[in-house]
Amino acid sequence: MKQFLVVLLILSFVHGIIRVPLKRQKSMRKILKEKGKLSHLWTKQGNEFLQLSDSCSSPETASEPLMNYLDVEYFGQISIGTPPQQFTVIFDTGSSNLWVPSIYCTSQACTKHNRYRPSESTTYVSNGEAFFIQYGTGNLTGILGIDQVTVQGITVQSQTFAESVSEPGSTFQDSNFDGILGLAYPNLAVDNCIPVFDNMIAQNLVELPLFGVYMNRDPNSADGGELVLGGFDTSRFSGQLNWVPITVQGYWQIQVDSIQVAGQVIFCSDGCQAIVDTGTSLITGPSGDIEQLQNYIGVTNTNGEYGVSCSTLSLMPSVTFTINGLDYSLTPEQYMLEDGGGYCSSGFQGLDISPPSGPLWILGDVFIGQYYSVFDRGNNRVGFAPVVFYETTTNGA
């Protein structure tokens, strides 16, 4: 009888886990660079491209820097409606809303992506409220709708989401994603929309109120990574998870004890705040600190991009984040990004987040790619452990 109960518990746990394969594709930065548009983007956006105001705290509107999504390379699939309409999205722990382009959107960015057709879904319910997010110098606007959302065969009923009818500039036009699915706390959501993961919890679709993220940093691998909703994969990391308490519920915000370069504490000597964000590819920090950090690691500024010849990586120092008493080190090979042609760009970027939310550091994919990350809503904490890299051979539960 005891063995039967153990087996039953295991089966129940597996049933409540949703494994979402992540694909790794070219980032907007690489696409824009190949098309010769990157320097124009830096010039056009100016400082606003690298600033985030505290207006994101308002439930009616939000402000996001375009730079957050410029380097994102990891995407997953969802569907909305009945019959299902497919979309490629960023699973973003730095925001809380779900939005996709609407068929009524005529912006260039929309016409090049999958667009939601409410009239073709038998489960669609109109909401009609306006939706607004500011991205850099442009705005994403739309209306709210309600429909079922499916992630890897698991369907969330009555999910409120945004249908964008206008998207900013030409930047999203070159992106590999249609929309964004936010995984942050509900109080960060525009228009007080309940996030998808919160509805999964409320509708008993996941076994545990947490999720794990693995990002494969090998550019030659077909396996981009995996998002596990309702659990985490112990085979993806070594040792034990180091649990870090959330300091402010909104973003997945934590305390960083200090930041070292070559073993010497340079930044955050008295501690500082950081958010763990799958929707930001790089590691960002206050622009003054990041400029110093670029000098410490030895990269040079060329047309707004910091980098060096890849042949010099062995001469560069490691950068270490001390979090909850443990050191998380990144080698030059881990924090520098190979752009091709023997050039490597810095994985650090200046981003000024104004008070009261900031200043903040953002631990994006450059960090998460080296440390498996578990986001635990039930206990309001984040767990980290060194990633174990291996190729995925099956999609088993």
Curated annotation (Swiss-Prot):
Catalysed reaction equations from the record: Similar to cathepsin D, but slightly broader specificity
Residue ranges constituting the Peptidase A1 domain according to the UniProt record: 74-385
Residues the record marks as carrying a glycan: N139
GO cellular component, as recorded: endosome
Cell compartments where the protein resides: Endosome
EC identifiers of the protein: 3.4.23.34
Keywords assigned: Aspartyl protease, Disulfide bond, Endosome, Glycoprotein, Hydrolase, Protease, Signal, Zymogen
InterPro entries recorded: Aspartic_peptidase_A1, Aspartic_peptidase_AS, Aspartic_peptidase_N, PEPTIDASE_A1, Peptidase_aspartic_dom_sf
Annotated disulfide bonds: C105-C110, C268-C272, C310-C344
Family the entry assigns: Belongs to the peptidase A1 family.
Record's function text: May have a role in immune function. Probably involved in the processing of antigenic peptides during MHC class II-mediated antigen presentation.
Quaternary structure annotation from Swiss-Prot or TrEMBL: Homodimer; disulfide-linked.
Name of the protein: Cathepsin E
Organism name: Aquarana catesbeiana (American bullfrog)
